[in-house]
Amino acid sequence: MENFEQREEQKPIKKKGSVLKSFIGWVVYVALLVGLVVGTPKALSYILKSEYPMAAITSGSMWPTLKTGDMVFIQGIQSRNEFEVGDIVVYKNPQGFTIHRVEEKQKDVVITKGDANNTLDTPVKYEDIIGKTVEFRGKPFKIPLLGNISIILNR
């Protein structure tokens, strides 16, 4: 019994200051996390000149270059001269957005195709193309699996 009593006496008593310090630490941590979640897309939007600076790959149409769940970064496009055949572009369509490779540039439209697809897409008007993927060493810069978070949250 005496041993038990000694243990209880040795328990440190938390001071009000340490609880407050811990609480403030958590508040700062949460504020920084919220700042990153909100601020990163805004900063990327400004840097990349794109309303949509990041995109999650939601299908296998660009396999093996881009896989479902990859996160890619989108550089905004202001004119038809800012991309060429072979670039991967993002364009608006009635279902949302599509990320496919440019196969051909014609006078009024662009012909695209997913790398894993056998057929060409419906021609895309130049004004519907909003950007192209950011490249690093000649390949799309992507973060594997990070896009899965967006895919899950948008279900």
Name each region found by the language model.
Residues 72-73, 90, 130:
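Hydrophobic beta-strand signal
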Residues 77-82, 94-98:
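Short, charged beta-turn/beta-strand-edge "cap" motif at the junction between a beta-strand
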